[in-house]
């Protein structure tokens, strides 16, 4: 396992609440939303605009727009001591000075991504079955995500392996940090924790909340109580 450079390694090890948000272009409140969510206890914040209401209305984010949104998130993350993640794009992660690059199964090969972003940023990987989990445990990624636990509109058409995969990963007792992902909200969180997860990724549980800070705080309190 690669040893992450300080202070990113300790920050990742202590993280339990990971938020994926779109750029909120149709609302125009990204800065206020991000600050509220981070104040509520979010440890990592990732920009993922694919399939968002903003994308449907305005079209895909251009690189310059994505960097502008990431600058907003970076400022909020620095104020709150959180990590900033970029989805898929190693070049954007490098340009934004992101702490984390998250790769899906069909994204850049890991060695290529590492050459682009350099030694400092963390790299995460999505996993959806036992074989992918085994690969993520063995390869030089710093963390991995396990799911979807439930079908989710952010990944339309993807079969959800469910909590069975979460239980399997928990039984492996790997030292590498991992996060359960996919359809997790406050009501479902106890099931996820009972399955053995201690870290989660959420989207709508916070992005759709009337009070993002309070929603994040309730999730974080439930996580740290285990």
From Swiss-Prot:
Main function: Condenses 4-methyl-5-(beta-hydroxyethyl)thiazole monophosphate (THZ-P) and 2-methyl-4-amino-5-hydroxymethyl pyrimidine pyrophosphate (HMP-PP) to form thiamine monophosphate (TMP).
Protein family according to the UniProt entry: Belongs to the thiamine-phosphate synthase family.
The scientific name of the source species is: Mycobacterium sp. (strain JLS)
Task: Kindly give the NCBIfam families that the UniProt entry links to this protein.
Answer: thiE
Q: Which UniProt keywords apply?
A: Magnesium, Metal-binding, Thiamine biosynthesis, Transferase
Q: What is its EC number?
A: 2.5.1.3
Cofactor remark: Binds 1 Mg(2+) ion per subunit.
| Catalytic activity reported | 2-[(2R,5Z)-2-carboxy-4-methylthiazol-5(2H)-ylidene]ethyl phosphate + 4-amino-2-methyl-5-(diphosphooxymethyl)pyrimidine + 2 H(+) = thiamine phosphate + CO2 + diphosphate; 2-(2-carboxy-4-methylthiazol-5-yl)ethyl phosphate + 4-amino-2-methyl-5-(diphosphooxymethyl)pyrimidine + 2 H(+) = thiamine phosphate + CO2 + diphosphate; 4-methyl-5-(2-phosphooxyethyl)-thiazole + 4-amino-2-methyl-5-(diphosphooxymethyl)pyrimidine + H(+) = thiamine phosphate + diphosphate
Chain sites annotated for binding 4-amino-2-methyl-5-(diphosphooxymethyl)pyrimidine: 46-50, 87, 126, 155
Q: Where does 2-[(2R,5Z)-2-carboxy-4-methylthiazol-5(2H)-ylidene]ethyl phosphate bind?
A: 152-154, 183
Q: What is this protein called?
A: Thiamine-phosphate synthase
Which pathway does the database say it acts in?
Cofactor biosynthesis; thiamine diphosphate biosynthesis; thiamine phosphate from 4-amino-2-methyl-5-diphosphomethylpyrimidine and 4-methyl-5-(2-phosphoethyl)-thiazole: step 1/1
């Amino acid at each position: 396992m690669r040893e992450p450079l300080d202070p990113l390694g300790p920050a990742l090890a202590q993280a339990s609440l990971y938020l994926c948000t779109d750029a909120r272009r149709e609302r125009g409140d990204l800065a206020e939303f991000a600050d509220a969510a981070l104040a509520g206890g979010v440890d990592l914040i990732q920009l993922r605009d694919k399939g968002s209401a903003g994308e449907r209305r305005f079209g895909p984010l251009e690189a310059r727009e994505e960097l502008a949104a990431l600058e907003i998130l970076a400022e909020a993350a620095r104020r709150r001591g959180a990590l900033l993640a970029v989805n898929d794009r190693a070049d954007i992660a490098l340009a934004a000075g992101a702490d984390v690059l998250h790769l899906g199964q069909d994204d850049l090969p890991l060695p290529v991504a590492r050459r682009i972003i350099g030694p400092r940023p963390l790299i995460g990987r999505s996993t959806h079955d036992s074989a992918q989990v085994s690969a993520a445990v063995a390869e030089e990624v710093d963390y991995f995500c396990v799911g979807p636990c439930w079908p989710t509109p952010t990944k339309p058409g993807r079969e959800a392996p469910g909590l069975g995969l979460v239980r399997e990963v928990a039984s492996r007792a790997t030292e590498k940090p991992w996060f359960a992902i996919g359809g997790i909200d406050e009501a479902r969180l106890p099931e996820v924790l009972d399955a053995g997860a201690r870290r989660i990724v959420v989207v709508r549980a916070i992005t759709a909340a009337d009070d993002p800070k309070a929603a994040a705080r309730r999730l974080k309190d439930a996580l740290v109580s285990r």
